[in-house]
A protein has these predicted regions:
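Short loop/turn microsegments at loop-to-beta-strand junctions
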Residues: 89, 106-107
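Hydrophobic beta-sheet segments that form the core/acyl-binding groove
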Residues: 60-96
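Short coil/turn motifs at secondary-structure junctions
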Residues: 12, 82-83, 96, 109-113
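Residue-level signal for glycine
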Residues: 98-100
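Hot-dog-fold acyl-thioester-processing enzymes
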Residues: 1-56, 103-105, 112-181
């Protein structure tokens, strides 16, 4: 099932060049993925009720044309390959002129939050998402980034309460913010 949602670009979504920030793009992806999970019955309410939730493992994003302030974006997402431990979710971003602006893929796992362990993605979950056989990138796997041997900049950071997400850990978006610093 392909899920679609419209987002309007506001001031907080743009940089000094009047273009979408990378963090904003990831936030849009996360939100539409969450709305799709809500529809499938495995979203935020499920996490609170069952103590199980989706955890992002990695992303791959390609921006083809940067949206600007005021643009209305239609974002499409769908679950694809699912196995007992991980699943992939793809995204396409279109502007109001129906131009493809960005594509992305992400890899997720289901975690038992109380135990901090990976939980099985069972047949009921797979059926609820109705995975698509459609890929935005030719290669299926997301290449893992390698940490540089030397860092030009280091800061000490103490996790704040506002950094904690529904799964009880630092939200993945804040890591990108820290990397920019």
């Amino acid at each position: 099932m392909i899920f679609k949602e419209t987002f309007k670009m506001g001031l907080k979504d743009i940089d000094k060049q009047n273009q979408i920030k990378n963090v904003t793009l990831l936030e849009f992806f996360e939100n539409i993925g969450s709305y799709h999970s809500d529809l499938a019955g495995y979203g935020a309410d499920y996490t609170k009720e069952h103590g199980r939730g989706w955890v992002l493992l990695d992303w791959k994003v390609q921006v083809l044309k940067r949206p600007k302030y005021g643009d209305e974006l239609e974002i499409h997402t769908w679950a694809k390959t699912m196995n007992k431990a991980t699943t992939y979710r793809d995204f396409e971003v279109y502007n109001q002129n129906k131009e493809l602006c960005a594509i992305a893929t992400s890899r997720w796992t289901m975690v038992n939050i109380k135990e901090g362990k990976i939980d099985k993605i069972d047949a009921d979950i797979i059926k609820a998402y109705d995975p698509e056989d459609k890929n935005v990138f030719e290669e299926k796997e997301v290449t893992k980034l390698k940490a540089p041997k030397d860092f030009s900049n280091e800061i000490e950071y103490k996790v704040r309460r506002k950094d904690i997400d529904i799964n009880g850990h630092m939200h993945n978006i804040y890591y990108l913010d820290l990397a920019y610093e």
